[in-house]
């Protein structure tokens, strides 16, 4: 089951999930991509998103406006839907309308092998890594996340040295091996690191939970601001989305 948490009043770009992407609302684009892989449900926090999904025949449920994270919203949706305890749950984003089907499939496969949860990352360049909107991740020898940050990690102390490890940009999608793991994560108290960085995935690392990271090839970009949207519409084309 794929859940897409969709919040109307995003702090940096209000109503962005309803913005037009080549003739379809952004959240509808995201859901159509997800439905190519598995059954998808949008977890809405507002009737306007719910009505938009229904208009385009996208399954949706109405959740509380008061969740602290998309993961918490996913859990409420899972509870409303009555998913079985052993069913895998993927948490995709409502602001990733250009996410490729292949990336979702890679996450699904990684989730099967993850002891707790899985996510994805892609290789990025130094210029991309400078943006605090693009979260970076560093891995251990088993491809588990060591840390996620909006800062540049790993930092290259010797600027003349050749970088020995690629910079990895996090793709904010998550896979949970089963419903119980999702419940376990949401039951943990928020930690200071996630509050500082505003990154919910740091809660899992703080409590020593493993996040398996699958490195993928992706041209997708998350839409955090109006500028992001305008830039993306210049890069992508309707033909590319109708794959």
UniProtKB/Swiss-Prot annotation:
<comment type="similarity">
    <text>Belongs to the KdsB family.</text>
</comment>
<dbReference type="Pfam" id="PF02348">
    <property type="entry name" value="CTP_transf_3"/>
</dbReference>
<comment type="pathway">
    <text>Nucleotide-sugar biosynthesis; CMP-3-deoxy-D-manno-octulosonate biosynthesis; CMP-3-deoxy-D-manno-octulosonate from 3-deoxy-D-manno-octulosonate and CTP: step 1/1.</text>
</comment>
<comment type="pathway">
    <text>Bacterial outer membrane biogenesis; lipopolysaccharide biosynthesis.</text>
</comment>
<keyword id="KW-0448">Lipopolysaccharide biosynthesis</keyword>
<dbReference type="GO" id="GO:0033468">
    <property type="term" value="P:CMP-keto-3-deoxy-D-manno-octulosonic acid biosynthetic process"/>
</dbReference>
<dbReference type="InterPro" id="IPR003329">
    <property type="entry name" value="Cytidylyl_trans"/>
</dbReference>
<keyword id="KW-0808">Transferase</keyword>
<keyword id="KW-0963">Cytoplasm</keyword>
<dbReference type="GO" id="GO:0009103">
    <property type="term" value="P:lipopolysaccharide biosynthetic process"/>
</dbReference>
<protein>
    <recommendedName>
        <fullName>3-deoxy-manno-octulosonate cytidylyltransferase</fullName>
        <ecNumber>2.7.7.38</ecNumber>
    </recommendedName>
</protein>
<keyword id="KW-0548">Nucleotidyltransferase</keyword>
<dbReference type="InterPro" id="IPR029044">
    <property type="entry name" value="Nucleotide-diphossugar_trans"/>
</dbReference>
<dbReference type="InterPro" id="IPR004528">
    <property type="entry name" value="KdsB"/>
</dbReference>
<comment type="function">
    <text>Activates KDO (a required 8-carbon sugar) for incorporation into bacterial lipopolysaccharide in Gram-negative bacteria.</text>
</comment>
<dbReference type="GO" id="GO:0005829">
    <property type="term" value="C:cytosol"/>
</dbReference>
<dbReference type="GO" id="GO:0008690">
    <property type="term" value="F:3-deoxy-manno-octulosonate cytidylyltransferase activity"/>
</dbReference>
């Amino acid at each position: 089951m794929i859940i897409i948490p969709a919040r109307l009043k995003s702090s940096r770009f209000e109503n962005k999930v309803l913005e037009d992407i080549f003739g379809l609302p952004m959240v509808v684009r995201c859901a159509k991509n997800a439905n190519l892989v598995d059954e998808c449900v949008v977890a809405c926090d507002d009737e306007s998103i719910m009505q938009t999904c229904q208009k385009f025949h996208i399954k949706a449920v109405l959740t509380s406006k008061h969740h602290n994270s998309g993961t918490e919203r996913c859990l409420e949706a899972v509870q409303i839907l009555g998913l079985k305890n052993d069913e895998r749950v993927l948490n995709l984003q409502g602001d990733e309308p250009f996410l490729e089907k292949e990336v979702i499939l890679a996450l699904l496969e990684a989730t099967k092998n993850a002891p707790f949860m899985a996510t994805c990352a892609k290789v990025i360049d130094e210029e991309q890594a400078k943006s605090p909107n693009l979260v970076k991740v560093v891995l251990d020898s088993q491809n588990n996340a060591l840390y996620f940050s909006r800062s540049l990690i790993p930092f290259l102390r010797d600027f003349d040295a050749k970088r020995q490890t690629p910079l990895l940009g996090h793709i904010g999608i998550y896979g949970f091996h089963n419903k119980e793991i999702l419940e376990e994560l949401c039951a943990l108290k928020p930690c200071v690191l996630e509050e500082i960085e505003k990154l919910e995935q740091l809660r899992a690392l703080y409590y020593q939970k493993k996040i398996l990271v699958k490195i993928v090839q992706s041209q997708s970009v998350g839409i955090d601001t109006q500028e992001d949207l305008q830039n993306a519409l210049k890069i992508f084309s309707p033909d590319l989305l109708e794959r």
